[in-house]
Swiss-Prot record:
Protein name according to UniProt: Translationally-controlled tumor protein homolog
Pfam family, one: TCTP
Function comment: Involved in protein synthesis. Involved in microtubule stabilization.
Organism of derivation: Mycosarcoma maydis
Upper classification of the organism: Eukaryota, Fungi, Dikarya, Basidiomycota, Ustilaginomycotina
Similarity field: Belongs to the TCTP family.
Assigned keywords, A-Z: Cytoplasm, Cytoskeleton, Microtubule, Protein biosynthesis
Gene Ontology molecular-function annotations: calcium ion binding
Length: 167
């Protein structure tokens, strides 16, 4: 199993225990699911029936996104202007780290990141934003959106902002 941590904050962001797809060689799209949790519950990956989910919610449980819950990602807010200001600084930090570790990757990162950033801005109101557990303002902000069905959540993580560790 591989664990992916933010190269800036060192927060654990996701793992390959979830279905991951590399998109345009710049971001990972990671399929998520809504789960119901209550105090003391542990997510073992089972999919409860709708009746069980409704019953659990009646007993004070809450519905959460599995990856957000498992990696203790923290919800944060941006307007378009503040997100673009954050993204500019974040991309500069990632580029600097990349220049040290893999300088040949820098041009592809810059081109891919700029193109994907345009997609984010084009559908800005569809996205939700999450930081790592430490809430480091310099660290990665993961993006949450929903598939075309309007029900299935997925998260987007910047490929070059993650460090892969085998566990």
């Amino acid at each position: 199993m591989k664990l992916f941590t933010d190269i800036i904050s060192n927060d654990e962001m996701c793992s390959d225990g979830y279905e991951m797809k590399l998109v345009e060689d710049v971001v990972y799209e990671v399929d998520a699911a809504k789960i119901v949790v209550s105090d003391g519950d542990v997510d073992i990956g089972a999919n409860p029936s709708a009746e069980e989910a409704a019953e659990a919610l009646e007993n004070g449980a809450e519905q959460v996104i599995n990856i957000v819950h498992s990696f203790r990602l923290q919800s944060t807010q941006f307007d378009k202007k503040s997100y673009l200001a954050y993204l500019k600084g974040y991309m500069k930090s990632v580029k600097a780290k990349l220049a040290e570790s893999n300088p040949d990757r820098v041009p592809a990162f810059e081109k891919g990141a700029a193109a994907f950033a345009k997609k984010i801005v084009g559908s800005f109101n569809d996205w939700e934003f999450f930081t790592g557990e430490s809430m480091d303002p310099e660290g990665m902000v993961a993006l949450l959106n929903y598939r075309e069905d309007g029900v299935t959540p997925y998260l987007v993580f910047w490929k070059d902002g993650l460090r892969e560790t085998k566990i």
